[in-house]
């Protein structure tokens, strides 16, 4: 198996081809009622150190779909991360 792949909870194979290889990967997870854009400056600072930064808007937050701030099942929500 390639180091440039992962599987999601539905067992879908996700592949990417990096242009450069970062020193590390940081995932920024926002809090309730927030969105990933709040961390743009932090992400840029970390990225300038050669570290790959990833974040997303959780379902029901920011630009993602879903009823705002509504999580019916944390098990399902956890599958999105």
Swiss-Prot record:
InterPro entries: AB_hydrolase_fold, Hydrolase_4, MAG_DAG_Lipase
The protein, known as: Protein K6
Protein family (similarity comment): Belongs to the poxviridae K6 protein family.
Residues passing through the membrane, by range: none
Domain of life from the UniProt record: Viruses
Organism the protein comes from: Vaccinia virus (strain Western Reserve) (VACV)
């Amino acid at each position: 198996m390639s180091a440039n792949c992962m599987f999601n909870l539905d067992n879908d194979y996700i592949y990417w081809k990096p242009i450069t290889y970062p020193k590390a990967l940081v995932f920024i997870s926002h809090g309730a009622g927030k969105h990933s854009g709040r961390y743009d400056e932090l992400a840029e600072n970390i990225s300038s150190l050669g570290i790959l930064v990833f974040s997303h808007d959780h379902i029901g937050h920011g630009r993602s779909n879903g009823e705002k701030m509504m999580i019916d099942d944390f098990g399902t929500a956890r599958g999105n991360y």
